[in-house]
Amino acid sequence: MSITFGELVGNFILVTGSVIVLLLLIKKFAWGAIESILQTRSQQISRDIDQAEQSRLSAQQLEAKSQANLDASRLQASKIISDAKEIGQLQGDKLVAEATDEAKRLKEKALTDIEQSKSDAISAVKTEMSDLTVLLAEKIMGANLDKTAQSQLIDSYLDDLGEA
């Protein structure tokens, strides 16, 4: 079975004509629907791309806002820590100053108490000495002294003791 050139050309023309008729029929009856489907799909893809871009921009804005909030929180936490350190330092300094003042006050009170005790002891010694002096003087003189003479004698005796 051999095919001649004429048959080949005839088949070619027949197939080409059939394809052209088929394309014309598709264009007349189905092309509008196919074009509509392709247009709808193109619009859907375009909307999806736009939504993806909007979502990306929204995510970037949200990320920037979150980062700004995080930075503000870090700054606020740092300020709180700094303020707490400063307050702690001030309170520590205040406590040290109060303790120093209290120590000075206690030292001054102790010195005052020592001076008072010393004065009381000297006064007690003077009184004791005056009594002894009076007794000694009475024995030596053989007579009782009145208060004025007693005071003068005591003062004189104490002055002599103070110089010694």
From Swiss-Prot:
It is a single-pass membrane protein. The gene is atpF. This is ATP synthase subunit b. Keywords: ATP synthesis, Cell membrane, CF(0), Hydrogen ion transport, Ion transport, Membrane, Transmembrane, Transmembrane helix, Transport. It comes from Streptococcus pyogenes serotype M1. GO terms for cellular component: plasma membrane; proton-transporting ATP synthase complex. The chain crosses the membrane at residues 6-26. It is found in: Cell membrane. One of its GO terms (molecular function) is proton-transporting ATPase activity, rotational mechanism. It holds the Pfam family ATP-synt_B.
